[in-house]
Amino acid sequence: MEPTMGGEMESGGGAATGECVNRIPVPRPPSIEEFTIVKPISRGAFGKVYLGQKGNRLYAVKVVKKADMINKNMTHQVQAERDALALSKSPFIVHLYYSLQSANNVYLVMEYLIGGDVKSLLHIYGYFDEEMAVKYISEVALALDYLHRHGIIHRDLKPDNMLISNEGHIKLTDFGLSKVTLNRDIDINMMDILTTPSMAKPRQDYSRTPGQVLSLISSLGFHTPVAEGNHDTANVLSTQVSETSPLSQGLTCPMSVDQKDTTPYSSKLLKSCPEMVASHPRMPVKCLTSHLLQSRKRLATSSTSSPSHTFISSMESECHSSPRWEKDCQESDDAAGSTMMSWNTVEKPLCTKSVDAMETKSFNERDLELALSPIHNSSVVPATGNSYVNLAKKCSSGEVSWEARELDVNNINMTADTSQYCFHESNQRAVDSGGMTEEHLGKRSCKRIFELVDSSPRQGIIPNKKSCFEYECSNEMRDCYATQRTGFAFEVQDLKLLVYRDQQNDCVNKENVGSSFTDKHQTPEKSPVPMIEKNLMCELDDDCDKNSKKDYLSSSFLCSDGDRTPKSIHMDSDSSFPGISIMESPLGGQSLDPDKNIKESSLEESNIEDLLPVSPSCQESTLPKGVECPTIQDSNQKMLAPSSEVLKPLTSKRNAVAFRSFNSHINASNSSEPSKMSITSLDMMDVSCAYSGSYPTAITPTQRERSDMPYQQTPNQVKSETPYRTPKSVRRGAAPVDDGRILGTPDYLAPELLLARAHGPAVDWWALGVCLFEFLTGIPPFNDETPQQVFQNILKRDIPWPEGEEKLSDNAQSAVDILLTIDDTKRAGMKELKHHPLFSGVDWENLQHQKMPFIPQPDDETDTSYFEARNNAQHLTVSGFSL
């Protein structure tokens, strides 16, 4: 007879007395396989959302592809989104239940809000009346106040990310661009989740099961996906070996790892291969680690920005790839006989393939690397290595009947696809595009993406950046502007802000320049303005009164004021930032249309390399001690006036705005050699119309060794763990925020983000002001045909206030004004809103209990029709599943 719970406890306690002991199975960690797919809901810029079911409860499951996040250099943002949702326990923020992952995807399991998003509701209503808008803005303001008090900045606030609950209340979601500040360098822990600061007496609504807590504190493993069943190899090859996963001693199989006290299946999941040892006793694991560790150091394939993410998460099963939730992109693996492993099949013996069949093949080092490489493309692996690859991948051979139920989302058509909003060079692969052209397969990128990897990572050092002639960055990129809308969040690739300059301010001093970089096809008078290479986006202010300092500079870029048109140059080669644009235009005859009067040119790599060697005398005299460097003023303050006053302070100086292209990578150098050049201080750069300075002073580490490059040291350089970041000694002003990229939806970006200034919670209040205007009028205040024009409208604060019968009330217009204040230090926040006349009738203490103007009336609990309006507006056709 089955013992009762009390009997179990008694038998457990009486083990010493000889009573019968009942074995209690150890609970398994939560898995995505426990959820059933119902239907897709919607799609965003960085992931897809599906309706999932576990038991009798429905969940919204956000699926993010690891490969996409690695390619976009946004792995830290997925971690930030998980942390922000896990830390938040507010009635106005979506609740996160699980954070799961597989070899290829990350799954955020959240509560499903059946009312859809506010953007869809706004499309149906057209615009909201003032009372309705005030209620929605009030609840969002409380959510923002909660986040800011807990060190979280949303940074992507917009109606699309406001969901409507069953009772009609607002909840914020999509923290993919958020910033989480914990005032420490470690990830969130269990205490952060169980006892958040605002919950002195936690409510039952926010309680979590042990499995949920375990999933939320697990480390997200953003290594590149490996062969199924070969996850242990990544641990073995890691620079640090976990105590729970020590490297097996002696002559063992490369896959053998002795894990103790893990899951009940660990003894069956991790086995040594005696056949392998017997057949090849001279190839122990130690023979492989040195080479593969060197490859990892060069290619950074199995680590993220945080050292704590080096290991594969304990929540990720060793041979678990969730076939029901993801589609295997390597179809050739099935042809080779490899199968994916799930919890259903973990009890099957490992290494079922006989090793005797391989004894006739040469077990050389390259084949082992192919078998143990973190990622590979089995379709292009040489035949000599296929058997070893299959050995490492073939963990089991059974029960794949349910694998046919794969998620099919290839019918999600987007005429306004996210890739269209990425302003990319024409030859660079768009992240969301369907595939790679043949010509691109031969060009190796610094990011190890599946389509491009066709050999061992231990081959020659991969070139970090393409040469400049591989980019066609003029007409094609500008042509895509005309058809773009600005509703999607995306990464701004080539942000071009036209900055006015004085027509009479001519700083070109051609005679004092020792040597100049001029294209062989151009005269010195028409030399292109170079990009300013800096590790963070910055706005550089010219000082044209210090021409005498150019005598000490070895080379310069020349431009003439005779050329009055805006200039944009995309220079790659060994430059730090491919795709950075500098645009200058005269005060007179200025047009805001980026398609007009733009001259673009590029410096060919061959010409640059010919000019790179610098004599010792030049490098020593780059900047003498006694010379005071030109100051780089924060000209952002000059942009703080309304549109009628913006141009006035800019007429005395000429400004150049340099912005990073988002196809360039942060810390993207794959080279393991020490830096050939440290990024020199901006003190040594004369940022004038003749951008002077020795060219190598702004070069980041490259893949190619150049013995003729001189070393230049930055004064008082601070040693850093990451040698490829800008040293702190050369940074001016406020500490840089994150990686300096501009992320978000153009219409809702705050001016400080566009101007690359340090930003804080004020960016969310700016976005709230944009949302308030949009609720009252139906369109965002800075909306325009192209993102470029939107950015100009934001910087000018060009707001088209409704007139006549559509005129907003004085209180509403005043509320928008105080939120849309250019100066972030004077921008309104929660305190100002509570005392504003527009919100005088709001009961801030009982907002979650107030009656809302719109309450969803779905057909059933799986109804997703409230999301359709937004999907249709963005031309998203969400298909079902092909089972």
Curated annotation (Swiss-Prot):
Phosphorylation at Thr-745 by CDK1 during M phase activates its kinase activity. Maximum phosphorylation occurs in prometaphase. GO terms for cellular component: centrosome; cleavage furrow; cytoplasm; nucleus. Residues 301-314 have a biased composition (Low complexity). Gene3D superfamilies: Phosphorylase Kinase, domain 1 (3.30.200.20), Transferase(Phosphotransferase) domain 1 (1.10.510.10). Serine/threonine kinase that plays a key role in M phase by acting as a regulator of mitosis entry and maintenance. Acts by promoting the inactivation of protein phosphatase 2A (PP2A) during M phase: does not directly inhibit PP2A but acts by mediating phosphorylation and subsequent activation of ARPP19 and ENSA at 'Ser-62' and 'Ser-67', respectively. ARPP19 and ENSA are phosphatase inhibitors that specifically inhibit the PPP2R2D (PR55-delta) subunit of PP2A. Inactivation of PP2A during M phase is essential to keep cyclin-B1-CDK1 activity high. Residues 1-23, 298-317, 511-530, 569-597, 706-737 are annotated as: Disordered. This is Serine/threonine-protein kinase greatwall. Residues 35-839 form the Protein kinase domain. Its EC number is 2.7.11.1. The modification Phosphoserine is found at residues 295, 373, 456, 556, 560, 635, 661, 672, 729, 879, 882. Residues 840-883 form the AGC-kinase C-terminal domain. Belongs to the protein kinase superfamily. AGC Ser/Thr protein kinase family. Its main location: cytoplasm. InterPro entries: AGC-kinase_C, Kinase-like_dom_sf, Prot_kinase_dom, Ser/Thr_kinase_AS, Ser_Thr_kinase_AGC. It is an enzyme of class 2 (transferase). The modification Phosphothreonine is found at residues 209, 224, 523, 726, 745.
